[in-house]
């Protein structure tokens, strides 16, 4: 594959209702210092990506009403890299919109663009180890036509996370310290406690981190197979953005089914690669 431009998209559209009244509609959790005494969660998210991706190519995708506050937050990225979704269409709509934006901005069919997707509400224990994990999965999706994700080795039988079942013949002894690539067998919904205990004991199940990685051309092609209306919409939105037809973009986006990226694409994709995280992680949602 020719020279690849790496792009990152931080999903930051949530309102953080769990943290009310500290987190409010126009000052949500991603703009609070919840996991660091000095940095907001968005600052932390951007800083984790900087070792791998130039800040000029780091984007934050959010709601229209949060754009001013995020642009004023001093994240060290260009103002135009704060992208507003026209309305809410769950994570599938969010990432379809992001892909269309990148196709319009960078041109081409996306084959020279790889995209890392993270969220602004994760607690990550070690930025260096995180960067090593992300670098590994980016290498995978840049070398073969697969979608990618990061799996978190479970530390307890949690009923609060979805799980990823990986194909592992023998669980490596260094699984907790060396990022390795595995093929995903299945995505599992949040389980009851007895099932979660089975997953943890089995050794080939990981928490679903909700982080995704792909070459954009591969992403669009996979949507062509999983949900052709989404593949068509991504291309149509990119074309409308290129010619400056934002009302047309909004009309297309509003017509999308509101569905998660797991349900719409990841569970139906031809092949998904997973790299195990080697860092402490939690979703504080």
Segments the model singles out, each with a brief description of its role:
Residues 31, 82, 147-149, 274:
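Conserved beta-strand scaffold positions in the cores of enzyme catalytic domains, especially
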Residues 1-11, 17-28, 35-119, 123-131, ...:
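Conserved N-terminal catalytic core of the sugar/cofactor nucleotidyltransferase
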Residues 123-158:
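Conserved donor-nucleotide/metal-binding helix-loop-beta segment in metal-dependent transferases, i.e.
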Residues 10-12, 61, 116-119, 149-153, ...:
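Short beta-strand segments
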Residues 1-4, 11, 51-53, 107-111, ...:
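Solvent-exposed alpha-helices and their adjacent loops that cap or buttress functional pockets
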Residues 46, 50-53, 74, 102, ...:
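Structural signal for hydrophobic packing residues in well-ordered secondary-structure cores
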Residues 163-285:
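Catalytic core of tubulin tyrosine ligase-like
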Residues 68, 91-92, 123-127, 156-161, ...:
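Short, well-ordered, mixed-charge alpha-helical segments that flank or form enzyme active sites
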């Amino acid at each position: 594959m020719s020279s690849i431009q790496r792009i990152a998209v931080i999903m930051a559209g949530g309102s953080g209702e769990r943290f009310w009244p500290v987190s409010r509609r126009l000052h949500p959790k991603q703009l609070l210092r919840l996991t660091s005494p000095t940095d907001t969660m968005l600052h932390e998210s951007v800083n984790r990506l900087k070792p791998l991706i130039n800040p000029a190519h780091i984007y934050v995708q959010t709601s229209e009403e949060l754009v001013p506050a995020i642009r004023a937050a001093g994240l060290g990225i260009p103002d135009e890299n704060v992208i507003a979704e026209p309305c809410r269409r769950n994570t599938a709509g969010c990432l379809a919109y992001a892909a269309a934006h990148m196709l319009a901005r960078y041109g081409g069919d996306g084959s020279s663009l790889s995209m890392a997707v993270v969220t602004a509400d994760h607690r990550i224990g070690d930025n260096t180890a995180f960067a090593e994990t992300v670098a590994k999965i980016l290498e995978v999706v840049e070398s073969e036509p697969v979608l990618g994700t990061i799996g978190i080795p479970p530390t307890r039988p949690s009923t609060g996370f979805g799980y990823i079942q990986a194909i592992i013949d023998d669980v490596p002894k260094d699984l907790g310290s060396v990022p390795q690539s595995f093929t995903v067998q299945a995505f599992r919904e949040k389980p009851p406690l007895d099932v979660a205990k089975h997953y943890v004991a089995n050794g080939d199940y990981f928490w679903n981190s909700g982080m995704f990685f792909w070459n954009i051309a591969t992403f669009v092609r996979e949507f062509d197979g999983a949900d052709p209306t989404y593949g068509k919409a991504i291309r149509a939105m990119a074309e409308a953005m290129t010619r400056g037809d934002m009302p047309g973009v909004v009309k297309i986006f509003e017509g999308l089914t509101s569905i998660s990226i797991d349900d719409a694409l990841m569970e139906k994709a031809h092949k998904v690669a997973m790299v195990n995280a080697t860092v402490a992680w939690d979703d504080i949602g």
